[in-house]
């Protein structure tokens, strides 16, 4: 889901479309969700509300306290819509899930994905980014591309090796699912700046320097080998983008 908490608030206040929106933590201490317009203003996740209050007023930013009951209800609606398209759908977090499209004609996957994006929007009002790829790690990257390139209309289907390589050559290593800040620093120190650079490392280096099997799975996934099952995925980040 795109900017999930902010999108939920907009569902019940259509006049907010096009206006910057932020959602605060339970005690109104800091920003935990931002609309694209709020991001464009330079507002960051974790910004203290009291430090940004004047700036928010000056820029006509709509500010909401967290409404977890609302977000939970909207999440259920989104996930139920997704499950109607795949019998194997695993909810990963309140605003994210993985779906298994095994058995669907690859030639129709792009149109199938667009149909899902449009149906979720119609049923719930929530915009989503759907990444389709040979592995979960690549699908996460494809989903990020949807948010960067509006012309994709919410669905990015990566399957040709040459296209995947082009994307990985431009994709920062720190943005790869499961890397984390500690490994990002280690990889940058080893001149590994992109996801593609990471795929060019030897499996021995990955195993020795990054803690064994989990990192090796990530390396294999980026190389197109599906090896992260639904039952052994990394834990999601706590904050909602």
Model segments located where?
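Generic non-transmembrane alpha-helical segments
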Residues: 77, 81-85, 115-124, 186, ...
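DNA-contacting surface of Y-family translesion DNA polymerases
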Residues: 175, 183-241
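Short acidic, glycine/serine/threonine-rich loops at helix termini
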Residues: 8-10, 33-36, 138-146, 211, ...
